[in-house]
């Protein structure tokens, strides 16, 4: 049992490294204008995370459109705004499919 747990930890570490490599490649391809290739890299990274039953890293999760799956580059194919109407939050709009993602901002309690 201990051997299996050690193997799982090692394989999850390898999977996390592969996800980081794929997301860096997706960022490069999206910067150069090859959006289809970057979508494929994002999809591969998601499949690896699902197969290993591990959560997708938060730093990369916010850079992916949940509707069309494209890699978001702020200012190029995504618009970022801060709003404080009902509650303070960041609004990220994908300019390819016009989907909106809202991320709440934690405020310090008085």
Curated annotation (Swiss-Prot):
Optimum temperature is 36-38 degrees Celsius in the absence of L7Ae, 48-50 degrees Celsius in presence of L7Ae. Its cofactor is Zn(2+). It is found in: Cytoplasm. Binds 1 zinc ion per subunit. Zn(2+) binds at residues 65, 68, 94, 97. One of its GO terms (cellular component) is cytoplasm. GO terms for biological process: tRNA 5'-leader removal. InterPro entries: RNP4, Rpr2/Snm1/Rpp21. It catalyses: Endonucleolytic cleavage of RNA, removing 5'-extranucleotides from tRNA precursor. The keyword Metal-binding applies. Its EC number is 3.1.26.5. Keywords: Cytoplasm, Endonuclease, Hydrolase, Metal-binding, Nuclease, tRNA processing, Zinc. Pfam families: Rpr2 (PF04032). Its main location: cytoplasm. One of its GO terms (molecular function) is zinc ion binding. Belongs to the eukaryotic/archaeal RNase P protein component 4 family. Part of ribonuclease P, a protein complex that generates mature tRNA molecules by cleaving their 5'-ends. Consists of a catalytic RNA component and at least 5 protein subunits. This is Ribonuclease P protein component 4.
């Amino acid at each position: 049992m201990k051997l299996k747990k050690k193997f799982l930890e090692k394989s999850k570490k390898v999977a996390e490294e592969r996800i980081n490599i794929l997301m860096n490649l997706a960022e490069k391809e999206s910067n150069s204008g090859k959006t289809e290739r970057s979508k494929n890299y994002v999809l591969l990274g998601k499949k690896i995370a699902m197969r290993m039953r591990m959560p997708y890293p938060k730093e990369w999760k916010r850079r992916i459109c949940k509707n069309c799956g494209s890699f978001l580059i702020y200012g190029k194919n995504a618009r970022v705004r801060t709003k404080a109407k009902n509650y303070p939050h960041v609004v990220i709009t994908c300019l390819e499919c016009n989907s909106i993602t809202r991320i709440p901002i934690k405020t310090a309690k008085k």
